[in-house]
Curated annotation (Swiss-Prot):
There is a cross-link at residues 183-197 (2'-(S-cysteinyl)-histidine (Cys-His)). It comes from Solanum lycopersicum. This is Polyphenol oxidase F, chloroplastic. The keyword Metal-binding applies. Signal peptide: none annotated. The keyword Chloroplast applies. It catalyses: 2 catechol + O2 = 2 1,2-benzoquinone + 2 H2O.
Length: 585
């Protein structure tokens, strides 16, 4: 991820006129104003309006799988211990905003990421939603027509033009700097770095961030109904960079992207620095499996989906979607082959300089809504410390505001929503099995003989005793079985990913994730902590496995086999112990 040279964006000529040569191709996708979808029933199939190429044959092949489309078949219910107390996070002190850092060597971002400080900084009011006449409906980017694309390009061009004044809070670079300041150590609270990743602040911060960014774009083209598109990477037909972002010379294009991942290349939602030599159909299948695991299996309750409370530790633990696919999409898009620090998308400080960042996070935000629709105990957190945490933003009129988490829980109340769309991962529970029966756990070393583990430099297997077996349905609803990795340490300036499997040994084919035995993955994106020289991260990693044990047929077993397969950076990962716990939701 880049050297100390910042991304330089071209300054466009000033044009205050709101007239523009929109392309009118009579598309049914979008009519003025920008209202691509209204309300409707969730559909079972979806036709895209963008042109398709040869690679779409594989997309259709995935569509033909009889488990791809349709809803239903979910397992809700229990999980995780109640959230620990952590004081509400106040908005950052802009007057003490400092230097942001890029890497563990102390490399400073060569420009200030701090926002302009308003004259009345000590009396910034709370934001109140303006009157709304109709919802802004965020469309899937891959299906957008040329009229919509022209509007989006124009709005982004005008935002870039505002960079003439480097202190204009509505300028493209100033908007990108919001992410840099909140994520690369520029803000401190109580002497600790303020970080909006790796905790329960992740979803609400980015929702508010996109809310104001979207409204600024709309104001620049006098269209209050303009809505950001979302990168539909959870659907096979959206698993590539949306075409509107891959046009050189467009205001939506960013030179600092991985050039090997352009022109319709299928994204790997588990990507961590290395391209897999796997057929496209298998990559898409793996993607849908990852989505099912992250949204359904591993996130039956709020604490696993949102992440851990932010307290004295600036990075207490991320939720399932932040882990995967959020982070791998950043890495896959960023230009790590040519840039020293993965710019733009591959580093927090520069991610907002790529317009695709906002499209990516629109789909991350959409996952918040989709997750709550699955049911069970999937609902917003009720912890007051979370609800009362605050952030600072400028609105489209350059007015400064404070905002609270509690006011962003319902996207419709904020004035935006997503159209009814198929979510094929909902019915993509892995059903194929690697083995026909139970692995002989007596032939595998017990956990006490394997841990503490000094380094995960190769695949390892071990047997683990469960706290209870043959649990009733009521017991499962009350408590989730949690596979827990205690005191896991690694250098958090390095890429890390390893996969976890149950009921298989270390000979498992880890390139095929669409197996019932695949439990989940752990990932980490390189990042820094301001001036902190200690980059060894000590975390607890958990996976909810109640559903998994049912699917594999191990509910009545007292002992199970667990296999860890390192993908990237395993040689730097140590784990003190592993256990299975029963925890309340």
């Amino acid at each position: 991820m880049s050297s100390s040279t910042p991304n330089t964006l071209p300054l466009l000529s000033t044009n205050k006129s709101l007239s523009s040569p929109f392309t009118n191709n009579h598309s049914t996708f979008l009519s003025k104003p920008s209202q691509p979808f209204l309300h409707g029933r969730r559909c079972q199939s979806f036709k895209v309006s963008c042109n398709v190429g040869e690679h779409d044959k594989n997309l259709d092949a995935v569509d033909r799988r009889n488990v791809l489309l349709g809803l239903g078949g979910f397992y809700g219910a229990a999980n995780l211990a109640p959230l620990a107390s952590a004081a509400p996070i106040p908005p950052p002190d802009l007057k003490s905003c400092g230097v942001a850092h890029i890497d563990d060597k102390g490399t400073e971002v060569s420009y200030s990421c701090c926002p302009p400080v308003p004259d009345d900084i000590d009396s910034v009011p709370y934001y109140k939603f303006p009157p709304m006449t109709k919802l802004r409906i965020r469309p899937p980017a891959h299906a957008a027509d040329e009229e919509y694309v022209a509007k989006y390009q124009l709005a982004t061009s005008r935002m870039r033009e505002l960079d003439k004044d480097p202190f204009d809070p509505l300028g493209f670079k100033q908007q990108a700097n919001i992410h840099c300041a909140y994520c690369n150590g520029a803000y401190k609270i109580g002497g600790k770095e303020l970080q909006v990743h790796f905790s329960w602040l992740f979803f609400p911060f980015h929702r508010w961030y996109l809310y104001f960014y979207e409204r600024i774009l709309g104001s620049l083209i006098n269209d209050p109904t303009f809505a950001l598109p979302y990168w539909n990477w959870d659907h096979p037909k959206g698993m590539r960079i949306p075409p509107m972002f891959d046009r050189e010379g467009s205001s939506l294009y960013d030179e600092k992207r991985n050039q090997n991942h352009r022109n319709g290349t299928i994204i790997d939602l588990g990507h961590f620095g290395k391209d897999v030599r796997t057929p496209q159909l298998q990559i898409m299948t793996n993607n849908l499996t990852l989505m099912y695991r992250q949204m359904v299996t591993n996130a039956p309750c709020p604490s696993q989906f949102f992440g851990a409370p932010l307290g004295s530790d600036p990075e207490p633990g991320m939720g399932t979607i932040e882990n995967i696919p959020h982070t791998p999409v950043h890495i896959w898009t960023g230009d790590s082959p040519r840039q020293g620090h993965g710019e733009d998308m591959g580093n927090f400080y520069s991610a907002g300089l790529d317009p695709l960042f906002y499209c990516h996070h629109a789909n991350v935000d959409r996952m918040w809504n989709e997750w709550k629709l699955i049911g069970g105990k999937r609902r917003d957190l009720s912890n007051k410390d979370w609800l009362n945490s605050e952030f600072f933003f400028y609105d489209e009129n350059r007015n400064p505001y404070r905002v609270k988490v509690r006011d962003c829980l319902d996207s419709k109340k904020m004035g935006f929503d997503y159209p009814p769309m198929p979510t094929p991962w909902r019915n993509f529970k892995p059903i194929r099995r690697s083995s026909s029966g139970k692995v002989n756990t007596a032939s595998i070393a017990p956990v006490s003989k394997v841990f503490p583990l000094a380094k995960l430099d190769r695949a390892i297997s071990f047997s683990l005793t469960r706290p209870a077996s043959s649990r009733t349905t009521q017991e499962k609803n009350e408590q989730q079985e949690i596979l827990t990795f205690n005191k896991m340490a690694y250098d958090d300036t390095k890429y890390v990913r390893f996969d976890v499997f149950l009921n298989v040994d270390k000979t498992v084919n880890a390139e095929e994730l669409d197996k019932a035995e695949f439990a989940g993955s752990y990932t980490s994106l390189p990042h820094v902590h301001g001036n902190n020289d200690n980059h060894v991260k000590d975390v607890t990693f958990t996976l909810a496995i109640t559903e998994l044990l049912e699917d594999i047929g191990l509910e009545d077993e007292d002992t199970i086999a667990v296999t860890l397969v390192p993908k990237v950076g395993g040689e730097g990962v140590s784990i003190e112990s592993v256990e299975i716990k029963l925890e309340d939701c």
